């Protein structure tokens, strides 16, 4: 059910397995610990959980830690892989009592699949319709009690009936720089490389509040420290220095705010509109990117940090964007 690229395998090796290793999201951790202990005390399955928020904040990692703390198996799937009722039935009927089913991108489940999921979540029962028309029959299959953990970057796209069936719902927040710095230092030791505190702080500052980005940048910094042009200067150093980190991140095109070429291109398009709202489809066409990438990857951090505003008519650059691009609001010229 799970398929990993080489990069994702590396990410798995850096993933915390217990609460003590998991940094950040303190309020969520505190509540989950209570709910897990209560379920274990009553010898019941944990109630169904929904995690939502921007990508890369630890939804999958939290799910694996929950499974570890509950002492149960976790089976991982993604909504696009569950195309037919038979796909979901095969997954659910193979779950043992107390198992966790993690479905990523759960907002992409089709309405037909959702209909099958409702009784499974509420009554641990599958209702399968066999045949069609007047001769159609409903086959009821009892399921072992299980916990469904859904993850999504678009909670607003979940249907109300599905959302209401989750007993717990948590929104993951962007991380503070000090939390990301601690994550990077811990990960660097797992990678077998020592990283200076100032170097970890620099990676954290340019990671857009996102652990996944911080870990990706750390791996690329390590590459530059090992074999890049800066490697020769690293031979007599016991740890990766701040200077090496800055060199690597600058070479990667990640500026001091964590913005790359795609982010700056997006902001430039907004700024060129001279304060007029621009529709998402227009921005996507101008950037040659799909709308989902813009909504899920580019916009969340920019929105959270006040670089744009969403209105009924579209996206509008904030004064902060004009300041970043050094463009006086009333004197905007063509940027391209």
From Swiss-Prot:
Residues annotated for DNA binding in this entry: 310, 315
Ranges where the record places region Large ATPase domain (RuvB-L): 1-175
SMART domains per the UniProt record, alphabetical: AAA
Metal-binding in keyword set: no
GO molecular function, a single term: ATP hydrolysis activity
InterPro entries from the UniProt entry: AAA+_ATPase, AAA_lid_4, DNA_helicase_Holl-junc_RuvB, P-loop_NTPase, RuvB-like_N, RuvB_C, WH-like_DNA-bd_sf, WH_DNA-bd_sf
Amino-acid positions noted as binding ATP in the UniProt annotation, renumbered to this chain: 14-15, 56, 59-61, 122-124, 165, 175, 212
UniProt entry keywords in alphabetical sequence: ATP-binding, Cytoplasm, DNA damage, DNA recombination, DNA repair, DNA-binding, Hydrolase, Nucleotide-binding
Binding-site residues for Mg(2+), renumbered to this chain: 60
BP GO terms, sorted: DNA recombination; DNA repair
Keyword Transmembrane on entry: no
Compartments, record wording: Cytoplasm
GO CC, any one term: Holliday junction resolvase complex
Catalysis: reaction(s): ATP + H2O = ADP + phosphate + H(+)
Broad class of where this protein is predominantly found: cytoplasm
Stretches for region Head domain (RuvB-H): 256-336
Domain of life from the UniProt record: Bacteria
Region (Small ATPAse domain (RuvB-S)): 176-253
EC supergroup of this enzyme: hydrolase
Enzyme Commission numbers on file: 3.6.4.-
UniProt subunit comment: Homohexamer. Forms an RuvA(8)-RuvB(12)-Holliday junction (HJ) complex. HJ DNA is sandwiched between 2 RuvA tetramers; dsDNA enters through RuvA and exits via RuvB. An RuvB hexamer assembles on each DNA strand where it exits the tetramer. Each RuvB hexamer is contacted by two RuvA subunits (via domain III) on 2 adjacent RuvB subunits; this complex drives branch migration. In the full resolvosome a probable DNA-RuvA(4)-RuvB(12)-RuvC(2) complex forms which resolves the HJ.
General function of this protein: The RuvA-RuvB-RuvC complex processes Holliday junction (HJ) DNA during genetic recombination and DNA repair, while the RuvA-RuvB complex plays an important role in the rescue of blocked DNA replication forks via replication fork reversal (RFR). RuvA specifically binds to HJ cruciform DNA, conferring on it an open structure. The RuvB hexamer acts as an ATP-dependent pump, pulling dsDNA into and through the RuvAB complex. RuvB forms 2 homohexamers on either side of HJ DNA bound by 1 or 2 RuvA tetramers; 4 subunits per hexamer contact DNA at a time.
Domain note: Has 3 domains, the large (RuvB-L) and small ATPase (RuvB-S) domains and the C-terminal head (RuvB-H) domain. The head domain binds DNA, while the ATPase domains jointly bind ATP, ADP or are empty depending on the state of the subunit in the translocation cycle. During a single DNA translocation step the structure of each domain remains the same, but their relative positions change.
Family, per entry: Belongs to the RuvB family.
Protein name per the record: Holliday junction branch migration complex subunit RuvB
Annotated organism of origin: Helicobacter hepaticus (strain ATCC 51449 / 3B1)
Upper classification of the organism: Bacteria, Pseudomonadati, Campylobacterota, Epsilonproteobacteria, Campylobacterales
């Amino acid at each position: 059910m799970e398929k990993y690229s080489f990069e994702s395998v590396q990410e798995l090796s850096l993933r915390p397995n217990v609460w003590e290793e998991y940094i950040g999201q303190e309020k969520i951790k505190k509540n989950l610990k209570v709910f897990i202990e209560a379920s274990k005390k009553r010898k019941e399955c944990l109630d169904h959980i929904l995690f939502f928020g921007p990508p890369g904040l630890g939804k999958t990692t939290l799910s694996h830690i929950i499974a570890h703390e509950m002492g149960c198996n976790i089976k991982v799937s993604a909504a696009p892989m569950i195309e037919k009722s038979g796909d979901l039935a095969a997954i659910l009927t193979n779950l043992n009592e107390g198992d966790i089913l993690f479905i990523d991108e759960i907002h992409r489940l089709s309405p037909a699949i959702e209909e099958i999921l409702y009784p499974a979540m509420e009554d641990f029962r599958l209702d399968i319709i066999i045949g069609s028309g007047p001769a159609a029959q409903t086959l009821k299959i009892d399921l072992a009690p299980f916990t469904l953990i859904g993850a999504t970057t678009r909670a607003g796209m979940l249907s109300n009936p599905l959302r209401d069936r989750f007993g717990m719902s948590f929104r993951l927040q962007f991380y503070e720089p000090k939390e990301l710095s601690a994550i990077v230092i811990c990960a660097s030791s797992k990678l077998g490389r020592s990283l200076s505190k100032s170097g970890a702080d620099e990676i954290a500052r340019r990671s857009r509040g996102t652990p996944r980005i911080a870990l990706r940048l750390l791996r690329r910094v390590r590459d530059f420290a090992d074999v890049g042009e800066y490697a020769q200067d690293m031979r007599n150093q016991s740890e990766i220095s701040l200077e090496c980190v800055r060199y690597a991140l600058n070479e990667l095109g990640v500026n001091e705010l964590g913005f790359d070429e795609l982010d700056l291109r997006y902001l430039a398009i907004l700024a060129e509109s001279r304060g007029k709202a621009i529709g998402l489809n227009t921005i996507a066409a101008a950037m040659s990117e799909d709308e989902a990438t813009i909504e899920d990857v580019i916009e969340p951090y920019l929105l959270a940090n006040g670089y744009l505003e969403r209105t009924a008519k579209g996206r509008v650059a904030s004064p902060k964007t004009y300041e970043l691009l050094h463009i006086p609001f009333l004197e905007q010229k063509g940027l391209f």
